[in-house]
Each structure stands twice: as C-alpha cells, then as structure tokens.
Amino acid sequence: MSSESQSSSSGPSSSGSKMKDFNQRFRDLHKLRQRARKENHEQVVEEDRRSKLPKNHEAKKERDQWQVKELQDRKAAEDKGLDYERVRSLEMSADVTEKLEQKRKRKKNPDQGFTSYEDMTLRQHTRLTAALDPDLDSYKKMRECVGGEQFYPTADTLIHGNHYPTTAAMDKLTKDVHGQVKRREQYHRRRLYDPDAPIDYINEKNKKFNKKLDKYYGKYTEDIKDDLERGTAI
C-alpha cells in the first residue's frame, strides 16, 4: 500500500518537472529564433544599403581615412619639429617611395599618351607655366629703371632693342630648350613597369591577351597556376 502511494506521489512531480524543462527549452529556442530573425533582418537592411551606394564608396572611404591619418601624422611631426616627408620616407622602402613619387608626378600632369596636338600643346603650356620662377626683385628694378611708360608699352611705344636679358635668364632658356629637344627625341608613351611582376608573356600583344584572360578567368585558374609553380601534381 505504501509503495503504491509513493509511486503515485512521484509520478506527477516527475512529469511536471519534465514539462517545466520542456517549456524552458522551448522559450530558449524561441529567443534564439527571435534573435536570429532580428540579425538576419539587420543584415538584409545593411546589404540593401550597401547595394544602393556608389561602386567606389569603399575605396573612397578608405582614401578618406588614409587622408585623415596622414593629416594627423603630419601635424604630429610638425609639433615635434620634424619634416613629415623625410619621416615618411624613412618608414618606407626605397621602391615604394619611388612608386609614390612617380604616381604624384603623373597625377600633377598626367601623360595619357598622344591624343591630339591640342592636348600636347596644352600639356606643354601647363608644364612650362609651372616651371616659371619669376624674380620679383629684378622686375621691380627694371620697372624703376625703364619707367612706367616704357615698361607698360602701348600701341605707340617702340620697344625694339630696349630689352637686355640677363645671362642667368639666357642660360635658363637654353637649358629648357635642350630639355625639350631631349624629351621630344625620347618621347614614348610611358607604361608602368613592375620588376616584381611575373613574366608570363612573349611579346606586347601576348601580354595584352593574357591580361584579358586573367580578368575573366584569373580567379578560376589561380590554384592551377600555384600548383604549377610549386610543381605539385594536378
């Protein structure tokens, strides 16, 4: 009689505890489901936001961050009384510094090769104008010596034979003309050359063809190329 009463008393308690554990697990699963649902929704919203951004947004963002860091480093160097360009050059390797200098020159007056004679003339005018180094002291002295009427001629002013260039000015002109002749003789469309890049072409035409192939199929053949370079069996 006592054993029956004990079994009857333990039965409802065990079933109740099982039900309680089941309800707890169900609530935990429900919370996990709600959390996953929320995170998925946030990711979908973020992907939709990124898809509506310009294609160069990430690159522009990285460039802005790099510019901000450069300004901060430049200010820190100035506060310490150091030359920022020299400090940056010491932190970089020589080849990287050379590439950055070439990139800066191309950005200042980019050479896109021959397009038209008008563009070539404009580039030459821009380069020659940037190379001008006016001597204001000589300018003022010449104006005082010649006088305002002769220095600022009109249609009735005779200026033939009144100008006597200095020796330094003539040397500068001669040097510039010789430089123009040398550049004209050696002119060619400058192409970027990376000495560390792998040589997988036999001529210029084959090089262009390989670039086109790599553009469309490079991601599929990268593993095969690595295996061939290592000598691993395919």
From Swiss-Prot:
Main location: nucleus
Pfam families, per the entry: SYF2 (PF08231)
Family (UniProt): Belongs to the SYF2 family.
Organism: Caenorhabditis elegans
InterPro entries, per the entry: mRNA_splic_SYF2
An example Gene Ontology biological process: RNA splicing
Biased composition (Basic and acidic residues): 18-80
Coiled-coil stretches: 19-78
Species lineage: Eukaryota, Metazoa, Ecdysozoa, Nematoda, Chromadorea
Disruption phenotype: RNAi-mediated knockdown results in increased sensitivity to the heavy metal arsenite.
Composition bias, Low complexity: 1-17
GO cellular component, one term: post-mRNA release spliceosomal complex
Subunit structure, interactors included: May be part of a spliceosome complex.
Protein name: Pre-mRNA-splicing factor syf-2
Keywords linked to the UniProt accession: Coiled coil, mRNA processing, mRNA splicing, Nucleus, Spliceosome
Region span, Disordered: 1-80, 96-120
Cellular location(s): Nucleus
Domain of life: Eukaryota
Protein function: May be involved in pre-mRNA splicing. May confer protection against toxicity induced by heavy metals such as arsenite, possibly by negatively regulating the expression of phase II detoxification genes such as gcs-1 in intestinal cells.
